[in-house]
Swiss-Prot record:
One of its GO terms (molecular function) is glutamate decarboxylase activity. The keyword Manganese does not apply. Belongs to the group II decarboxylase family. Residues 471-502 are annotated as: Calmodulin-binding. Catalyzes the production of GABA. The calmodulin-binding is calcium-dependent and it is proposed that this may, directly or indirectly, form a calcium regulated control of GABA biosynthesis. This is Glutamate decarboxylase. GO terms for cellular component: cytosol. It catalyses: L-glutamate + H(+) = 4-aminobutanoate + CO2.
Length: 502
């Protein structure tokens, strides 16, 4: 949910209809319900005209969320769009499809589940809810253990990298858990496992590792984290577990790098979340959280309700929600199978390489994303003395592209990058077109007068006394310092986190 911040000015209180004026003569109030009804054609025209100013989802390279599905799946979605998922007694098949999806994902992530056993997991509205549920399970298990030992249980903490998505901050704030972040550094934009284990203490409910950083797409080293944390647990007698936030990478690593150990093959990994609406190839609104075993989900967190017709166990942060996302996920899993997902992910990775090569050939950017990871291309300007990545991002909108520019988290705030997310609907041709458009923009920006002297030193600002004798000290900032100053300004506008959506 985005909180409304629209300011209401007298001149903008009404909508003035264009083509809908055939049906409606009076201006339509913007922020109050109209007193009278209107023809359906007029309502459609008004809403449709408003939406024309939205960006093109296919050219929205900021988002990881799927923007295309096959027509057959669209039909299934429309036929089930009026089904409330929580009505399990009324729609038992939909519930069964969710259970099948949970088991498919549990096996994909190597959960220790036998062929005749049922995996433990639940469908959510996205990875944000999935992370909240996983975090609550860790917190409750930790509290129960501390209570049984007669120890304080009022100061839980969670260890993450500073590159985590904002939903982790929300979990910490909403559920009163201290967030201990491992700072980043230039050239290393993911959590350092050694530093993470170093700040683990007896109050740590879990360490969260990211399989596919939102910033660069890079996979964190979960295997090394497991090894180091196992050693510390043995030394201290603690039982600190690991959660893997595989929102983006959970549908990529199993198909492209099946030998990479990041999942339930590692003993300390107790839960994994993944976004079905990202590389699970489903429209927005579906995520999953899978637990290693029943013991990792405390029974007291599961509610049982019977007022919908039968006993229903439920563990969610919401209640009513659509069924179509679950149905669409099941469609994709059986439609594509392992082979199909592998082909889609290989194609995404191939298109990411095309874009990477094109950007590298320009000689203007440094690529900060990695070859192994989510198919994301993140790149920073080598020289920001004449213009910044924020200006490049803004100019790209003229061509229809939505490419975000943002700064890295602490302690790499002075690095600003552009990021392109390569989804299934981003083709080889689009990659080449984007490269061409970036080249055009750079040529235009090159004609602008320089903002700084060409000679700049990569140190602190140089102090210069004013010749006018006003007693004031004036500072000349070099290229790097000026870039940091610009970035600070953008950070004030954008807020603390610019990591996108789950």
């Amino acid at each position: 949910m985005v909180l409304t911040t629209t300011s209401i000015r007298d001149s903008e209180e009404s909508l003035h209809c264009t083509f809908a004026s055939r049906y409606v003569q009076e201006p339509l109030p913007k922020f109050k319900m109209p007193k009278k009804s209107m023809p359906k054609e007029a309502a459609y025209q008004i809403v449709n005209d408003e939406l024309m100013l939205d960006g093109n989802p296919r050219l929205n390279l900021a988002s990881f969320v799927s923007t295309w599905m096959e027509p057959e799946c669209d039909k299934l979605i429309m036929s089930s769009i009026n089904k409330n998922y929580v009505d399990m007694d009324e729609y038992p098949v939909t519930t069964e499809l969710q259970n099948r999806c949970v088991n498919m994902l549990a096996h994909l992530f190597h959960a220790p589940v036998g062929d005749d056993e049922t995996a433990v997991g639940v469908g959510t509205v996205g990875s944000s809810e999935a992370i909240m549920l996983a975090g609550l399970a860790f917190k409750r298990k930790w509290q129960s253990k501390r209570k049984a030992e007669g120890k304080p249980f009022d100061k839980p903490n969670i260890v993450t990298g500073a590159n985590v998505q904002v939903c982790w901050e929300k979990f910490a704030r909403y559920f009163e858990v201290e967030l201990k972040e491992v700072k980043l550094k230039e050239g290393y934009y993911v959590m350092d496992p050694a530093k993470a284990v170093e700040i683990v203490d007896e109050n740590t409910i879990c360490v969260a590792a990211i399989l596919g950083s939102t910033l660069t797409g890079e996979f964190e080293d979960v295997k090394l984290l497991n090894e180091l944390l196992t050693k510390k647990n043995k030394e201290t007698g603690w039982e600190t577990p690991i959660h893997v936030d595989a929102a983006s990478g959970g549908f990529i690593a199993p198909f492209l790098w099946p030998d990479l150990e990041w999942d339930f093959r590692l003993p300390l990994v107790k839960s994994i979340n993944v976004s079905g609406h990202k590389y699970g190839l489903v429209y927005a609104g579906v995520g999953w959280v899978i637990w290693r075993s029943k013991e990792d989900l405390p029974d007291e967190l599961v509610f049982h309700i019977n007022y919908l017709g039968s006993d229903q166990p439920t563990f969610t942060l919401n209640f009513s929600k659509g069924s179509y996302q679950i149905i669409a996920q099941y469609y994709q899993l059986i439609r594509l199978g392992f082979e199909g997902y592998k082909n889609v992910m290989k194609n995404c990775l191939s298109n990411a390489k095309v874009l990477t090569e094109g950007i590298t050939k320009m000689g203007r950017f440094d690529i900060v994303s990695k070859d192994v990871g989510v198919p994301v291309v993140a790149f920073s300007l080598r020289d920001s003395s004449k213009y910044t990545v924020f200006e490049v991002s803004e100019h790209l909108r003229r061509f229809g592209w939505i490419v975000p520019a943002y700064t890295m988290p602490p302690d790499a705030e002075h690095i600003a990058v552009l990021r392109v997310v390569i989804r299934e609907d981003f083709s080889h041709s689009l990659a080449e077109r984007l490269v061409s458009d970036i080249e055009k923009i750079l040529s235009e920006l090159d004609t602008q007068p320089p903002r700084l002297p060409t000679k700049a030193v990569r140190v602190t600002a140089e102090e210069v006394r004013d010749d006018k004798g006003d007693g004031l000290h004036h500072f000349h900032m070099d290229t790097v310092e000026t870039q940091k100053d610009i970035i600070k300004h953008w950070r004030k506008i954008a807020g603390k986190k610019t990591s996108g959506v789950c």
